[in-house]
Amino acid sequence: MSKISNALGRKDGNSGYTRVVGNAELGQLLSRVQATVISNGNELERLITQRCNLIENIDVFIEDTTRGNNVQNGVYLCLKKTFKKSKKYAESVKGIEPDMLIFIVESYRVCKVIELKDGDAFDTKKSQGEKEHLEKFATLFGAKIPFVTDYYICSFNQNDKKLIMAGFKGVFSLEHILTGKELCQILGISYQEILDIRRRDTEENFAYLIAEMMKIPEVREEVKKHF
């Protein structure tokens, strides 16, 4: 989980939060909370990738796998930033790259095209756009590699696939939905470990937010009215 203590937020005192609450200090603090929420997706990806077998060069990996050049059976993860450096595959799918690609190398070869979400509720237009990009990427990229390829949307923090489907306005069918636990099972990493780390960060965020709020004189005065 990202930490409020590390977030900058708006420094000019003119954030929407300041206009809503009428207090520059509180508005700036709330803008830091929002910045933390936005950065949570990147922090989640970092926690996942730290525990995986990362592909450093997708072109070399696919060529070595195809030719049987010392690629051991296992599960490998390719991030968007790595894929975008590809000289063989990136151009035809430019602008629709997914967050991650999981390659399973066994007696069969599978590529899972995955968009990772920290939340689970999106509007219809955004949901439809996500699906169209995933479908197109899986079709175009899948046609060029010797892997059975399919796409998935993953809502890491929701364990009920039907609720995920509802959150994406029914755009994704159940077979194209992954929970966070399922994603971690595929990658061979501990879902619970990631939850525990994020839970500790959540507790720290709560304590930090309250402490920072109580530094604001107007907040302290308002709190006194209720006790």
Swiss-Prot record:
GO BP annotations listed: DNA restriction-modification system
Keyword Nucleotidyltransferase in record: no
The protein's assembly and partners: Homodimer.
Record lineage: Bacteria, Pseudomonadati, Pseudomonadota, Gammaproteobacteria, Pasteurellales
EC number: 3.1.21.4
Protein name per the record: Type II restriction enzyme HhaII
Superkingdom, natural source: Bacteria
One example GO MF annotation: type II site-specific deoxyribonuclease activity
Annotated gene: hhaIIR
Enzymatic reactions: Endonucleolytic cleavage of DNA to give specific double-stranded fragments with terminal 5'-phosphates
